């Protein structure tokens, strides 16, 4: 009896130490993911060479982060008892990877959102992104696309809300995953990027 109690205690301590280790690793990855993207806030004032340099640095950081996170997910699964920051780090690394990895881990993200480990909006964003990348209409209206507008000989670039599956039910769908009404989202996002984001309900995915 005493031996079993000792073994149980050892198992608990091992689990706690493992959680601390994963938290440390993943929280560090979160910090790297965010710090390497700080330059994008003032991107409009940067030269082409500076943008290229920062972009390369971001790609290198993302690659290293992906190697670590995907190794954990593929070998151990999604670790339990992580901090919110550590869980967020995993989602960010998935979101900032390539299309094939976003699809690969989409179902896992859905499960974690249903469990409350991630927010439902995290899943909604990733789901919409994978749909857009496959040329399909999005569900929750989280994705923006830049496209050329041609008027005569003039060509201008415009930001558009990627087409949605159900425009009339969009706000209701957004509400189910904790997202703000679409008009509020478009205004906030337009202010953030300094360009108006247009929702043209007549456009279909074929127009892009």
Located regions from the model:
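Start-of-domain marker
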Residues: 20-79, 87
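Mature extracellular/secreted ectodomains of secretory-pathway proteins
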Residues: 73-145
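Short, 15-30-residue, compositionally biased linear elements
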Residues: 153-169
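Catalytic cores of secreted/periplasmic lytic hydrolases that degrade extracellular macromolecules
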Residues: 144, 183, 188-207
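Bacterial Sec-dependent N-terminal signal peptides
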Residues: 1-26
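Second-shell loop/turn segments in exported
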Residues: 51-59, 91-97, 156-161
């Amino acid at each position: 009896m005493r031996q079993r109690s000792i073994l149980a205690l050892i198992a608990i301590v091992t689990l706690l130490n493992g959680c601390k280790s994963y938290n440390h690793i993943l929280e560090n990855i979160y910090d790297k993911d965010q710090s390497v993207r700080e330059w994008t806030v003032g991107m409009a004032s940067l030269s082409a060479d500076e943008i290229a340099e920062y972009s390369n640095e971001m790609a290198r950081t993302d690659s290293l982060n992906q190697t670590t996170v995907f190794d954990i997910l593929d070998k151990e699964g999604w670790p339990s008892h992580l901090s919110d920051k550590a869980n967020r780090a995993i989602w960010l690394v998935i979101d900032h990877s390539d299309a094939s990895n976003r699809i690969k881990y989409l179902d896992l993200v859905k499960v974690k959102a249903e469990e409350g480990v991630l927010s439902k909006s995290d899943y909604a964003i990733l789901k919409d992104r994978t749909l857009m990348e496959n040329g399909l209409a999005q569900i929750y209206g989280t994705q923006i696309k830049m496209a050329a507008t041609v008027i005569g000989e003039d060509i201008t670039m415009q930001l558009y809300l990627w087409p949605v599956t159900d425009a009339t039910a969009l706000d209701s769908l957004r509400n189910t995953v904790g997202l703000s009404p679409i008009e509020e989202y478009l205004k906030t996002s337009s202010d953030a990027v300094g360009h108006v984001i247009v929702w043209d309900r007549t456009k279909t995915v074929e127009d892009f």
